[in-house]
Amino acid sequence: MKLIPDDNWRWYFDADQARLMLDLANGMTFRSRFSATMLTPDAFNPSDFCVEDAALFFTYQEKCLTLNIDAQAKAELVLNALVANRFLKPLMPKSWHFAALGHGEYCPQLGELVWVRLNERLEDACFMVVDTGDKASLCLLAQAELALSGKVMVLGEAIKIMHDRLCPVDEGADHAQSSLHFAHAG
C-alpha cells in the first residue's frame, strides 16, 4: 500500500500508549517511535497534517527510494522523520560514536541519505537527515539496526551528528556499499 497524504490526516497524542499518532483517515493509524519525554509541547495538542508536513513527506519519501528496505519500513522511516522534524525536542550531538571523515564544510540537505563510520569497529551505517543545523544535523537510522556502544539502535531512531562525521551516500556508495545495502537500478 502506498501512502498519499490528504486533508483528513490528523496528528494526536495517545496518552495510553504515550506516543504521538497520525490518523491516516482510512482506518489506519501510525504510531511514532518517540516517547512522550522526547516530544515538544506542540505534540500533545491535536493538529491537522498541514501543507508543510505533506511537502516534507514527499521530500523524505523521494530520498529513501534507493534504500533496500521494504515498503512498510520506508513508510515507517518517512513518518518518523516527519515526527522528528516537527515534534522532537532538540538533541545534543553524539558524534563521538563516529569517525571524523574530513569533509570540511559539508552541510547535508534535508532528507539526504548519509553514511558514517563507527569508531568502535570498522563498520559504516546509513542515516537520513531530517533536520539540518549549522554544524550538526538530526538524523534517523535508515537501516534495520545498528549496534552502538552496547545499545542497539533500530530503524527510525534519532541521533544528532556533527557534519564532519557525515558523508553523502552518493559520494561514498562504492566505499560503503557492503554495509549500506542500497537498491540498484538496472
From Swiss-Prot:
Annotated InterPro entries: ZapC (IPR009809), ZapC_C (IPR048372), ZapC_N (IPR048373)
UniProt main location, coarse: cytoplasm
Keywords, sorted A to Z: Cell cycle, Cell division, Cytoplasm, Septation
Top-level taxon in the UniProt lineage: Bacteria
Biological process terms in GO annotation: division septum assembly; FtsZ-dependent cytokinesis
Subcellular location: Cytoplasm
Pfam families: ZapC_C (PF07126), ZapC_N (PF21083)
UniProt entry tagged with the keyword Glycoprotein: no
Cellular component per GO, a single term: cytoplasm
Quaternary organization: Interacts directly with FtsZ.
Family: Belongs to the ZapC family.
Protein's job: Contributes to the efficiency of the cell division process by stabilizing the polymeric form of the cell division protein FtsZ. Acts by promoting interactions between FtsZ protofilaments and suppressing the GTPase activity of FtsZ.
UniProt-recorded name of the protein: Cell division protein ZapC
